[in-house]
Amino acid sequence: MVLDRPLAVGADGGHGVIRYYVSEYEPGRRVRFTFRPRTGIIGAHELSLDTLDDERTRIRHVLIGRARGAMRLMFSAVVAPLHDAVVEDLFDNAERETTGTVVRPATWSPRVRVLRRLTGGR
């Protein structure tokens, strides 16, 4: 994920052909990315942090949207598996950053490995 400026409402970015902009941002709590129309997804995805107690925080990722056009075919076959792998990597990175280790690291399926090679690693 690359943004054209520091994280703030209005920052534009994405990864590969998936494009979005920051539509809502609460520093340290929540960020919502709304998909650009040309992406073929009408909707948004959001990351949020919920403090559970002094020792635990829940990281939540929610994807709300509807695919249209060619994305209807691409989503299940290509986008969803790559997206899930990226989110799992993000959660692993957050765990590593906060605890110094990852108890159960995510692994990429053979399908994700092939798709990453075909899409240039995005």
Residue spans for each PLM region:
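Glycine-rich portal/gate segments that line the openings of hydrophobic small-molecule binding cavities
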Residues: 1-44, 93-108, 120-121
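Beta-strand/loop substructures that line and gate deep hydrophobic ligand-binding cavities in soluble
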Residues: 37-89, 105-107
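Short terminal or interdomain "cap/linker" segment that borders an active site or interface and mediates
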Residues: 112-122
